[in-house]
Amino acid sequence: RFENETIYHELGHFLAFVAGNVDRTSDFAAVYNSEKSKFTGINRSYATQNSSEYFAESVLEYVTSPSTLKRQRPKTYAAIVAALNKITDERIQRVMDIYGPFWS
C-alpha cells in the first residue's frame, strides 16, 4: 500500500471534475458496468458502489500500478487517459476563475 493513496483517490475525483465530470457520463457508465467486476483492490465494495468512486479508485491504481490497470481493465485505463487529455489550460483557467476566491 502506498502512503499517499487517499490523495490520489481525491485527485481522481478532481480529475473527473476538471475533465467535465467524465465519471458521470453514459460513456463512462458503460466502462464502469463492463469492468467493475474486475476490480481487485482492497476497497472493492467501496470502489465499485458507483461510477464516481470507481473512477477515483482507478486513478489511484493508474498512478500506483498503471501496467496492472491497463492489463486488467483496459477500458478503464483508456477512460483515465482520455480524461487526462481533456485537461487544457482553458479548463484549468475556468476552474481557477470560478473557485479561485474560495481557495485564496
Where are these regions (language model features)?
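Active-site-flanking segments in enzyme catalytic domains
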Residues: R1-S104
